[in-house]
UniProtKB/Swiss-Prot annotation:
Potential calcium sensor. Ca(2+) 2 binds at D76, D78, D80, E87. Ca(2+) 4 binds at D149, D151, D153, C155, E160. The lineage of its organism: Eukaryota, Viridiplantae, Streptophyta, Embryophyta, Tracheophyta. This is Probable calcium-binding protein CML16. It comes from Oryza sativa subsp. japonica. Ca(2+) 3 binds at D113, D115, D117, R119, E124.
Length: 181
């Protein structure tokens, strides 16, 4: 039995959408659910804006609006004004070039590195998770940091963060394809 259903569109534009994610993609579904504040199964521009403001407030309202519009343009492939789970999962599964992937990882790292010192502490992790509604105790944050802290300094540097993100992407099937050169 197929894991997809066909969305009714004009013949040359028919697109298959996943009806359910594979168990390995449960993390993507969990993140999608956090973005989908009203639980209607799709992310609206206002929901996307709320999450981006919580993670990293823009320098100005107009800059934030442009950023959300650019993200919606990339994510909303069927142009219905919303991002559904299939579009969200497809975006996270797209292959990226090494330089682009490195830049995305650096940007993600910088969100958590609140003081900009090149290290993520348990306190910084707790602050960012709190902003997005993922309340964690100090002990939970310390455990998360310790699970990634290879050099034992009590913090997560960029290289440790990058290894953790690549490991997690591989575990969920979202890793970039290995180079064959």
């Amino acid at each position: 039995m197929s894991n997809t259903t066909e969305k009714k569109m004009p013949q040359q534009q028919q697109v298959e959408r996943p009806t359910a994610l594979a168990p390995a993609d449960a993390e993507i579904e969990r993140v999608f659910t956090r973005f989908d504040a009203d639980g209607d199964g799709r992310i609206s521009p206002s929901e996307l804006a709320a999450v981006t403001r919580a993670i990293a407030p823009p320098p100005s309202e107009s800059a934030g609006g442009r950023e959300v519009a650019a993200m919606m343009n990339e994510l909303d492939t069927d142009r219905d004004g919303f991002v559904d789970l299939g579009e969200f999962a497809a975006f996270h599964g797209r292959g990226r070039g090494d330089a682009e992937h490195e830049a995305e990882l650096r940007a993600a790292f910088d969100v958590y590195d609140v003081d900009g010192d090149g290290r993520i502490t348990a306190a910084e992790l707790g602050k960012v998770l709190g902003r997005i509604g993922e309340g964690c105790s100090a002990e939970e944050c310390e455990r998360m940091i310790a699970s990634v802290d290879v050099d034992g300094d009590g913090c997560v540097g960029f290289e440790e963060f990058k290894k953790m993100m690549c490991r997690d992407a591989a575990a969920t099937g979202g890793a970039d394809k290995a180079k064959t050169e």
